[in-house]
Regions:
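Bacterial Sec-dependent N-terminal signal peptides
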Residues: 1-24
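Short S/T/G/P-rich N-terminal loop/turn motif that feeds into the first structured element of a domain
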Residues: 19-250
Length: 250
């Protein structure tokens, strides 16, 4: 019964954090790693493919260089933000498929070919802002603990609101992919020096205590330590030459 109740709370929580007037909240994302010695060929083929089949006003694709983490040296691709229905309605042309198979796929290592879907949680995010450089923090949580983790996220956001923090962040939930028990913090940064503001997820307990009090801060940190199994962080940098123009502000 307890598990049923927790599952119900989790589903309701996702509905609440995902609901907004604009239903374009879904990102499709993937990694693309060049085969040894084939980086130039991959990037040339991808640039040509995006220009031909993902231009402004068409199905958008954005690519980023991965600068840190286990996938450093790869490209990180995104399509979106979309409504779920857009994936049902999309029909790829045969020319699109053939061009990709001929000029992109032969130069890409397929060992890391998972495709994930992320959903933006606006009610858990704080002052989202566009950038061309991002710091991602992946929180891998215990299965079935989403409701508790959402409670932590709500408290953390409240602390930032009360302190009028200058560090903005977006929250995404992985709803399908390699690890569906993943929540992603997305920090926009202007330069590497700004990493200092996005590397204190729970280490910023002092600022939380000043706004929420010692007791509530301790409770939230205990939730975090209980439900988060591990983390991974990566820095990504926008590649306009490999991306659909005019969609970065989304």
């Amino acid at each position: 019964m307890k598990k049923v109740i927790l599952a119900f709370i989790y589903i309701v929580s996702l509905c609440l954090v995902g609901a907004q007037d604009n239903d374009q909240t879904v990102l499709r994302t993937w990694y693309m790693t060049p085969k040894d010695g084939k980086q130039k060929q991959l990037e040339k083929g991808l640039a040509d493919h995006v220009a031909k089949f993902h231009g402004q006003g068409s199905w958008p694709e954005l690519h980023f260089d991965v600068l840190s983490g286990p996938n450093a040296g790869s490209l990180r691709g995104f399509s979106g933000p979309h409504a779920w229905k857009a994936f049902d309605d999309r029909v790829r042309s045969q020319a699109d498929i053939d061009h990709y198979n001929k000029y992109v796929l032969p130069y890409s290592d397929n060992k890391n070919n998972s495709i994930d879907f992320w959903v933006f949680a606006p009610k858990l995010s704080y002052n989202p802002a566009p950038s061309t450089l991002y710091h991602f923090s992946y929180n891998y949580i215990v299965p079935g603990s989403d409701a508790e983790y959402v409670e932590f996220l709500e408290g953390f956001k409240k602390s930032k609101e009360l302190s009028k923090s200058l560090v903005s962040h977006k929250i995404y939930k992985t709803v399908s992919g390699k690890n569906p028990d993943t929540w992603v913090w997305v920090y926009p940064i202007s330069n590497m020096e700004e990493l200092s503001g996005s590397t204190q997820l729970v280490g910023g307990g002092g600022s939380m205590a000043s706004t929420l009090g010692e007791k509530e801060t301790k409770r939230l940190n205990q939730i975090y330590q209980k439900v988060v199994k591990s983390r991974m962080r990566e820095i990504i940098k926008f590649r306009p030459d490999l991306s659909t123009p005019g969609v970065m502000n989304n």
